[in-house]
């Protein structure tokens, strides 16, 4: 019987851990976790995301600060705000919502956030710590961190003897996911658009992770019977069966056929997606614990 992971359920349990850790930290040390979210311009999708993040931060008991800047904000003005938040002792996590308006360069802004406050896990120092296996000192990008919660809850902390294949080599997901699996002692293959015999490579995987942005690319004959399949793709495709001009969300995995072979599989939507905001909250409470000299909770 295949287990279909309910990402909302797992995310809710992560949030419960965050809430408990937040109240304990404040009670025992007087430190209240603080998250600052910065948004520039009026992109509706970005505003929806930011509202959800700010709402969740409040629900967790954090000090939740939102800075909404006008579209015409200059590079210097945005950099000055980040510098101000870096210096603010009440703020443990800083998130600059991407994408920024076209006239702004996001990379210098992201790299100007103090690594210990970089709760998105995008700073090169955090990427470097992960690449060198330092999971205790850095902050991990939220989506791969969330996918790893699924892996740990399925296989435990030690993946010795298990083969993992990650399709996709992006800095945002593929590379950090591979590094996390490797740190847990899996034997990891990073596959991508130039990989030869991709279905054959995937058939060796006990843990198969797809993150390439190609709708339903992974078919049943790519899946080893009994494997765990994690689908990180979010693709909007036409859905004529729902009416003219209608669309639906699908992942990078042909869910129905692969679910017949996999032992554990994540759906799209409702799988990895809900974990992203949950792990942002987890990173914030981890950062607050470190700042207070306390051992952070495990997720």
From Swiss-Prot:
NADP(+) binds at residues 168-170, 193, 234. It comes from the Bacteria. The keyword Amino-acid biosynthesis applies. It catalyses: (6R)-5,10-methylene-5,6,7,8-tetrahydrofolate + NADP(+) = (6R)-5,10-methenyltetrahydrofolate + NADPH; (6R)-5,10-methenyltetrahydrofolate + H2O = (6R)-10-formyltetrahydrofolate + H(+). GO terms for biological process: L-histidine biosynthetic process; methionine biosynthetic process; purine nucleotide biosynthetic process; tetrahydrofolate interconversion. GO terms for molecular function: methenyltetrahydrofolate cyclohydrolase activity; methylenetetrahydrofolate dehydrogenase (NADP+) activity. Keywords: Amino-acid biosynthesis, Histidine biosynthesis, Hydrolase, Methionine biosynthesis, Multifunctional enzyme, NADP, One-carbon metabolism, Oxidoreductase, Purine biosynthesis. Pathway: One-carbon metabolism; tetrahydrofolate interconversion. Pfam families: THF_DHG_CYH, THF_DHG_CYH_C. Its EC number is 1.5.1.5, 3.5.4.9. InterPro entries: Aminoacid_DH-like_N_sf, NAD(P)-bd_dom_sf, THF_DH/CycHdrlase, THF_DH/CycHdrlase_cat_dom, THF_DH/CycHdrlase_CS, THF_DH/CycHdrlase_NAD-bd_dom. GO terms for cellular component: cytosol. PROSITE patterns: THF_DHG_CYH_2. Homodimer. Belongs to the tetrahydrofolate dehydrogenase/cyclohydrolase family. Catalyzes the oxidation of 5,10-methylenetetrahydrofolate to 5,10-methenyltetrahydrofolate and then the hydrolysis of 5,10-methenyltetrahydrofolate to 10-formyltetrahydrofolate. PANTHER family: C-1-TETRAHYDROFOLATE SYNTHASE, CYTOPLASMIC, C-1-TETRAHYDROFOLATE SYNTHASE, CYTOPLASMIC-RELATED. This is Bifunctional protein FolD 1. It comes from Sinorhizobium medicae (strain WSM419). The lineage of its organism: Bacteria, Pseudomonadati, Pseudomonadota, Alphaproteobacteria, Hyphomicrobiales.
């Amino acid at each position: 019987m295949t287990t279909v992971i309910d990402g909302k359920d797992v995310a809710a349990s992560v949030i419960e851990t965050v809430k408990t850790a937040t109240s304990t930290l404040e009670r025992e040390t007087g430190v209240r976790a603080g998250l600052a979210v910065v948004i520039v311009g009026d992109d509706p999708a970005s505003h929806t995301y930011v509202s959800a993040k700010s709402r969740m931060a409040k629900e967790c008991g954090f000090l939740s600060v939102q800075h909404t800047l006008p579209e015409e904000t200059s590079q210097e003005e945005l950099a000055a705000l980040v510098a101000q938040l870096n210096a603010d002792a009440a703020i443990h996590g800083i998130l600059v919502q991407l994408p920024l308006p076209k006239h702004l360069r996001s990379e210098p802004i992201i790299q100007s956030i103090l690594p210990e406050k970089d709760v998105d896990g995008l700073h090169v120092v955090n990427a470097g710590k992960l690449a060198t296996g330092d999971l205790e000192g850095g902050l991990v990008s939220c989506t791969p961190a969330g996918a790893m919660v699924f892996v740990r809850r399925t296989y435990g902390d030690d993946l010795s003897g298990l083969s993992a294949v990650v399709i996709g080599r992006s800095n945002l997901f593929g590379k950090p996911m591979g590094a996390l699996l490797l740190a847990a002692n899996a034997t990891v293959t990073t596959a991508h658009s130039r990989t030869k015999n991709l279905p054959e490579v995937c058939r060796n995987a006990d843990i198969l992770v797809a993150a390439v942005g190609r709708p339903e690319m992974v078919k049943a004959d790519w899946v080893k019977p009994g494997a765990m399949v994690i689908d990180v793709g979010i693709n909007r495709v036409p859905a004529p069966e729902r009416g003219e001009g209608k669309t639906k969300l699908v992942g990078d995995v042909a869910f129905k056929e692969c679910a017949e072979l996999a032992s554990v599989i994540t759906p799209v939507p409702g799988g990895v997606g809900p974990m992203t905001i949950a792990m942002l909250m987890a990173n914030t409470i981890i950062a607050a614990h470190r700042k207070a000299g306390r051992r952070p909770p495990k997720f």
